[in-house]
Structure formats: structure tokens, C-alpha cells
Curated annotation (Swiss-Prot):
Keywords: Cell cycle, Cell division, Coiled coil, Cytoplasm, Cytoskeleton, Meiosis, Membrane, Phosphoprotein, Sporulation. The gene is ADY3. One of its GO terms (molecular function) is chromatin binding. Residues 50-78, 89-108 have a biased composition (Polar residues). Phosphorylated. This is Accumulates dyads protein 3. Its main location: membrane. GO terms for cellular component: chromatin; condensed chromosome; condensin complex; peroxisome; prospore membrane; prospore membrane leading edge; spindle pole body. Residues 241-328, 361-430, 477-498, 540-658 form a coiled coil. Residues 8-122 are annotated as: Disordered. Transmembrane segments: none annotated. It comes from the Eukaryota. Residues 39-49 have a biased composition (Basic and acidic residues). GO terms for biological process: ascospore wall assembly; ascospore-type prospore membrane formation; cell division; mitochondrion inheritance; mitotic chromosome condensation; sporulation resulting in formation of a cellular spore.
Length: 790
């Protein structure tokens, strides 16, 4: 029964297993490229069983975990939004703090702004130390060469008319400026915008120090009065600029929204990875995931378009604000200062701007250097990991070679045993042919001896049986032949004894050899299968590891090359900026006279810019409306994610129902309780572990085939199986033995059950109907029946 069932089910099961293995390999290839690692080197069925085991958690705990994860995500989003709003408000507050009163307020404002600025370096006199003085340090820790101000410029103080003045010991020399250079829009743009009030404070302080070093004590009083008026006007102007500088808040909110969108995209990708593992169980999830991916692509494209629009609007706003600010400053200077004061103010302004721009460039260069160092460290780590992986690959190869050598040895041993068995079979065939051809006095003595051995008669009965078959030998009784007869009889008895002993030995040895060969063949076949599986799994592991490390190295090299090229571009830009600033300093002095004549025309242009600002505000409102629509889309996506989570949870419950209770699963321990006579060797020989590798459909097909062939309903199957086993193991053996012995007594030969069973098996395979099978044994039994009752 087992033979023909295996014959029926083997091709389909092998095909399905091969297809499953191919799908598993494809799944591994897809998932291990996240490089996640792979996940693992385990087969898919083991990972599937692990997911089943993980899904055995009670439903209440899973629901609570899902609710807790959702609530924690919402809380983290709210906290991130609040922290970003507080940060933007703090920056706006620092921008609104304009200089008024005395220099102490300037120092406090600079301390607040420098604490929050991206240039986290040491400070001297409330100003960043980068580029100030010969002893100032660069971000890399080396002496700065960006300016040649003496060390004592920010050390002496003087109180005059209750105004604390940070007095310079000497005037600064040429500073590199580039006022028309527009900084590239980046994530740190709000730092630059927020430090505009700081630049105004630095300008005023620098003007005071210059006037105190260049004017006489009599002229200082009038100059201080003028500077006081300048401060009051600049404080009012700073308040108006702080209102205009509300754009960084919008930028911060947009950046926070972009970060939230990125976080949502990352979460969606994680959910996609989880859902991909359940693709084999539910095909409906594939369609839902495809919809989500399409929505993500559309949302990503729209977000890119919105970010481009925002960048364009930001550029316009920054340019317009800078132009309006320059126009108002020039108008104010024309009304309240002379031409010399204007020149000094503009030069101080350009120097301060150049100073701030150079600080920003230096900070960016320092940040890029840190990124390059980090990338180099990561590259070293990856090289170490690659060396370790190469060592592991070498070990795996050596293990594969050892396994191959063991497999070859086992195959050689199997061949030797097969050759020995064939040799003994030849010897037995030779002895059998010799006994069949043995004749004495033209009588078949050898055939008679073989039949007596088959019947199991004792040697003492040989003479009687021989005399019955050959009565002619009884007349030989003369004296001359009696002696020869006795001698021949003694020799024949000795030969018979020797032949019997030899035959018994040969038969016993042949049985032992057959049993040993069968046992060794089973062992070697199991070993060969196990070694082949191990070799395949290790080769797959090696290929996956090799692909994963190759992809990681390519990504890291690409990132390293990109950062390297960006650094080179930044260095080239910084050198160009320095050269252009030195050239433009001389050009600005010549162009100043022409700018004074053009100021009157700029007043008319200011009205035009105001209208353009209104238009830009309208566009900004449109963009905010678009962002609100995007937020509604994000909420819809979150709802779809929650529905997908519920679907995944329901699929896990369905999987749990399909898998059943693992505590009721049969293994060697549970089988030993109900069948104590079964040993571990017997349990392993039955091959029950193969059933764990079968799919749900394969296991159903196996049970259905059994029920159809046996023609037993499922309700009574477990009750009837013991009776079938008793019929096969006990009753069938007794009946076959009885029929065989009866046929031997009647016809002098045994029944050949194997050949008749093969004929019946071929008929069943052709028809697949047990009722139409005509067993050849029926004819033999009818012959026996006729012999006794006819």
C-alpha cells in the first residue's frame, strides 16, 4: 500500500516542493537586498513556522500591543511637532530682540543667538571666534587665517554716559566680502535668517569702536548722539524686519511636515516589508500594497513639486527682503549721516556680512570634513566585515569540500558492498547449478538432494526416500558391489554433510550480507541526502552573503564619492568667494558714487516690490492650502495603514486557525505514550518528519487519496485503521503462509506472491479502481479448491 501511494504522490509533491524552494529563494533574494541581511539563512518553512509560533500569542495581548504602538506613534508625532514649534518660536524671539539701550543688550542677544547657532565653537566678547584675531581657532582646531584683527580688539571696555562700549584697540583691515552672494537654500537656512538682527548689532558696535578710535574727545559727544539716534531707528526697523522674518517659522513648519512625511513613508515601507512575508497566504494584500505604493509615488512627486515651488518662493522672498532692507538703510543713512559716515557704515556692513558668510562656509566645511571622517571609519568597518565574511566563506568552502569527500567515501563503500553481494550471489548460483546437474547411475541425485533440503527432512530419512523414488537400487546386493556401495555411501554422506554445512553457511552469510547491504544502503542514502541538503544551504548562504556585501560596498562607495565631490565643490567655491571678495572690495568703493545716484530710482522700485510681495503672500497662502490638502491625504494614508494592520492581524488569526493547536502535535514523545513499543529508530524509519514539510494542500491530498483508495469515510477512518492493520500484519501473513504451504504440499512449489502482486499493481495503476483489479492469486486458489473438491 505504502509503495503505490508513494508512487502516486511522489511526482506532484516533488514538483510542489521544488516550486516552493524556488519561491523561497526568490523571496530571500528580494528581502535580503535591505539589506537585511536576509533575512536569515533558515529555510522559508522554518521561518514560516517561526511566524506561526510568534502568532500563537493571545489575541488580547496582540490587540493591546497594536493599540499601544498606534498611541505611541501619535504621541511621538505630537511631541515632535511641539518641539519644532518651540524651536521656531525661540528663533523668532531671538530675531525680534533688536538692539536698544546699550551694548549690554547686544551682548545678551549675541549670547542667546550664538548658543542656538549651528557654529558651536568658542566665543570671545559675545562673538564667534572663527576668523577673529590671529589667535582665533578654526573648527578643525588650527589658527584661523580668515582675518588679521589683533588679539586685544575685544578686551578693553569703557563706560561713557552710562553706555558700555566694547572699544577696539585698532581698526580691522580688509575683510573678504560678497554682499551680492545669495546663500544656497538648505536645512540650516533659518539660522542665517535669524542672525540678521545679530549682524545689525555687530554693525553698530563696530561703528562705535571705529568712531572712538578715529575721532577726538570733543567730537565724540556729537558722534555718540548721532549713534544713539541710529540705534533708536535701527531698533524700530529691527521690529519691522522681525515681522517680515516670519518666513522662517513657515519654513520650520514645512520642514517639520516634511520630516513627518518621511517618517510616515518609512513606517509604510516597514509595513510593506511585513506584508510581503504574508503574500503566499493572502493574495488580496498584494493589491492593497500596490495601491499604497502608487499613492506614495504620487504623494512623493507632489511633495517634490511643492518643495520646488517653496524653494522658488523662498529665493524671491529673501532677495526682496534684502533689497528692501538695503534701500531702507541707505535712505536712513542719507537723512541722518554724511557721506563719510555712509561709506564707513556700508564698509562695516559689507565686512560683517562677509564675516558671517565666511563663518557659515567654514562651519559647512567643518561639517563636511566630519562626514568624510565618519564615512572613512564606516568604510574601515565594512572592510573588516568583508574580511570576516571572506574568512567565513573560506571556512564554508572547506566544509563543503569535506562533505564532498565524505560523500565520495560513502559512495565507494556502497559500491564495495554491492560488489561483495554480487560475488556471493554468483557463488551460490554456481553451487545451485552444480547440485542441479549432479547425477549418479543416470539418476538426478542433485535435484533430489535439493528437494530434500527444501522440505527440511533429516539425513536419516534420505535413504528411505531415495529407495522409494529409485527402487532399482535395491537389487544390488552382491558381495563385490556391497563394499563399493558402502564406500560410496560413506563418501556420499560426507559430501552431503559438507554440502549441507556449506549451504547453511552460505545461506546465513548471504542473509547477513543482504541485511547489512540493505542497512548500509539506507544509512548512506540518508547521509547523502543530508550532505546534499547541507551543501545546497551553505552554497545559498554564501551567494546571499556575497550579494549583500557587494551591494553594501557599492552603496557606501557611491555615498563616499558623492560626499567627496561635494566637498571638492565647496572648497572650490570657498576659494572663488575669497578671490571674488578681494576683487570686489575695490570695485565697491568705485561703484558707491554711482549707487548714491541710483537711490532715488530705487524708491519707485520699492513700491513695485511691495506689490510683488503681496503676490508672493497670495502664492504662499495657496501653498499653505495645498499643504493642508496634503495633510488630509496623510490622514487618509494613516487610516489605510490602520486598516492594513487590522487585515494583517485577521490574517494571523486565520493562520493560527489553520495551523491548529501546537500542543496537540504528534512527535516522538507523544507517540511513545500511546504506542510504547515504538523506538526512536522505528519512528525515524517511518519518515514522519516529511509530513511537517508538506503544505496544507499536499496534506489534504494525501488524506483524501488514502480515504478514496481504502473506500473508508473520514468519520470511521480512525476506528477501522486498527482492523486494517490487524488484517495486514496478522491475518494476511497467516493466510499467505497457509496458502503457500498448501500449494507446496499439493503441487510441490511455493506461490510467487511478488510477481502476482506486480501484475495486480499494474492493473490498478491503469484503472485506478480497486474493484476492477483481477488478482492472479485467485486462479491459484481456484486450482487448489478444484484439487480438493473435484
Amino acid at each position: 500500500m505504502n509503495h503505490w501511494l508513494a508512487f502516486l504522490n511522489k511526482p506532484e509533491s516533488l514538483k510542489e516542493q521544488n516550486s516552493d524552494c524556488d519561491q523561497q529563494g526568490e523571496m530571500r533574494h528580494v528581502t535580503d537586498g535591505t539589506l537585511t541581511k536576509s533575512p536569515e539563512s533558515k529555510p522559508f518553512r522554518e521561518r514560516r513556522s517561526q511566524t506561526w509560533i510568534d502568532s500563537e500569542v493571545p489575541t488580547s495581548t496582540e490587540k493591546s500591543n497594536v493599540q499601544e504602538s498606534i498611541s505611541s506613534d501619535i504621541i511621538s508625532k505630537l511631541s515632535n511637532r511641539r518641539s519644532r514649534r518651540n524651536r521656531s518660536e525661540s528663533w523668532a524671539g531671538s530675531e525680534a530682540s533688536s538692539p536698544s539701550g546699550n551694548i549690554s543688550t547686544l551682548e545678551n542677544a549675541t549670547e542667546k543667538n550664538t548658543l542656538k547657532s549651528p557654529n558651536k565653537f568658542l566665543q570671545r566678547g559675545g562673538l564667534p571666534t572663527v576668523g577673529i584675531g590671529s589667535q582665533a581657532l578654526s573648527p578643525a582646531g588650527k589658527p584661523s587665517t580668515l582675518g588679521n584683527v589683533s588679539p586685544g580688539k575685544f578686551t578693553t571696555y569703557k563706560v561713557h554716559n552710562s553706555i558700555e562700549v566694547n572699544r577696539f584697540s585698532s581698526t580691522p583691515t580688509k575683510l573678504l566680502t560678497n554682499p551680492h552672494k545669495v546663500a544656497a537654500i538648505s536645512n540650516d537656512e533659518h539660522y542665517v535668517v535669524s542672525n540678521e538682527s545679530l549682524e545689525e548689532n555687530i554693525e553698530v558696535a563696530h561703528l562705535e569702536n571705529v568712531f572712538r578710535s578715529s575721532k577726538t574727545p570733543d567730537e565724540e559727544q556729537s558722534e555718540y548722539m548721532k549713534l544713539g539716534e541710529i540705534r533708536l531707528s535701527s531698533s524700530s526697523y529691527g521690529g519691522s524686519i522681525s515681522k517680515e522674518n516670519s518666513l522662517p517659522k513657515v519654513l520650520d513648519e514645512l520642514q517639520s511636515q516634511n520630516e513627518e512625511i518621511k517618517a510616515l513613508r518609512q513606517k509604510l515601507e516597514e509595513k510593506d516589508d511585513r506584508i510581503q512575508e504574508l503574500e503566499e497566504l493572502n493574495s488580496m494584500n498584494d493589491a492593497k500594497l500596490q495601491r499604497i505604493e502608487d499613492l506614495q509615488k504620487e504623494f512623493h512627486n507632489e511633495r517634490k513639486a511643492a518643495s520646488k515651488r517653496l524653494n522658488i518662493v523662498q529665493d524671491r522672498f529673501r532677495k526682496e527682503i534684502k533689497k528692501i532692507r538695503e534701500e531702507k538703510i541707505t535712505d536712513f543713512q542719507n537723512k541722518n549721516a554724511s557721506k563719510k559716515e555712509k561709506n564707513e557704515v556700508t564698509s562695516a556692513k559689507t565686512k560683517c556680512k562677509a564675516f558671517s558668510q565666511r563663518n557659515i562656509l567654514v562651519s559647512e566645511l567643518y561639517r563636511k570634513q566630519k562626514q568624510i571622517l565618519n564615512l572613512q571609519q564606516e568604510n574601515d568597518k565594512f572592510l573588516k566585515d568583508i574580511n570576516e565574511s571572506n574568512n567565513s566563506i573560506v571556512k564554508l568552502r572547506s566544509e563543503v569540500e569535506i562533505l564532498k569527500s565524505n560523500l565520495q567515501l560513502s559512495q565507494d563503500e556502497n559500491k564495495k558492498l554491492h560488489d561483495n553481494g554480487s560475488f556471493y550471489e554468483k557463488r551460490l548460483n554456481d553451487v545451485y547449478s552444480y547440485m542441479q546437474n549432479l547425477s549418479l547411475f543416470e539418476k538426478d541425485l542433485g535435484k533430489f538432494i535439493l528437494e530434500e533440503m527444501k522440505c527440511g527432512h533429516s539425513p536419516s530419512m534420505f535413504q528411505n526416500g531415495f529407495a522409494k523414488l529409485y527402487p532399482d537400487f535395491q537389487d544390488i546386493k552382491n558381495l563385490e558391489n556391497m563394499e563399493q556401495y558402502k564406500q560410496l555411501k560413506g563418501k556420499i554422506e560426507l559430501l552431503e554433510k559438507n554440502d549441507r554445512i556449506r549451504l547453511e553457511k552460505i545461506i546465513s552469510v548471504f542473509k547477513l550480507i543482504n541485511e547489512r547491504l540493505h542497512f548500509m544502503q539506507q544509512q548512506h542514502s540518508h547521509k547523502i541526502k543530508y550532505l546534499q541538503k547541507e551543501a545546497l544551504t551553505k552554497e545559498q548562504q554564501f551567494r546571499l552573503e556575497k550579494r549583500r556585501w557587494h551591494d553594501i560596498l557599492n552603496l557606501k562607495e557611491e555615498n563616499f564619492q558623492k560626499l567627496k565631490s561635494e566637498l571638492k565643490e565647496k572648497l572650490i567655491l570657498s576659494e572663488k568667494i575669497q578671490k571674488n571678495a578681494e576683487d570686489k572690495l575695490n570695485d565697491y568703493m568705485n561703484e558707491h558714487q554711482e549707487i548714491v545716484e541710483k537711490l532715488q530710482n530705487q524708491a519707485l522700485i520699492a513700491s513695485r516690490w511691495s506689490t510683488q510681495i503681496q503676490e508672493s503672500e497670495n502664492t504662499h497662502k495657496k501653498i499653505t492650502d495645498e499643504l493642508a490638502g496634503k495633510q488630509s491625504e496623510i490622514l487618509k494614508l494613516e487610516e489605510t495603514i490602520l486598516s492594513l494592520k487590522e487585515d494583517v492581524f485577521q490574517e494571523k488569526l486565520n493562520l493560527k486557525k489553520l495551523y491548529g493547536d501546537p500542543s496537540t502535535e504528534l512527535n516522538f514523545e507523544t507517540v511513545g505514550k500511546s504506542f510504547p513499543h515504538i523506538t526512536k529508530e522505528k519512528y525515524d524509519s517511518l519518515g514522519l518528519d516529511i509530513l511537517t514539510d508538506l503544505t496544507y494542500v499536499q496534506s489534504q491530498n494525501l488524506i483524501k487519496n488514502l480515504l478514496i483508495v481504502l473506500d473508508i469515510p473520514l468519520k470511521t477512518f480512525l476506528k477501522i485503521v486498527p482492523t486494517i492493520v490487524i488484517q495486514l500484519r496478522c491475518e494476511l501473513t497467516l493466510l499467505t503462509k497457509f496458502a503457500n504451504d498448501l500449494n507446496l504440499k499439493v503441487f510441490g512449489k511455493q506461490l510467487d506472491f511478488k510477481s502476482r502482486r506486480k501484475v495486480a499493481m499494474n492493473e490498478f495503476l491503469n484503472n485506478h479502481d480497486i474493484a476492477e483489479v483481477k488478482h492472479p492469486l485467485e486462479y491459484d486458489l481456484q486450482a487448489l479448491f478444484k484439487y480438493f473438491f473435484s
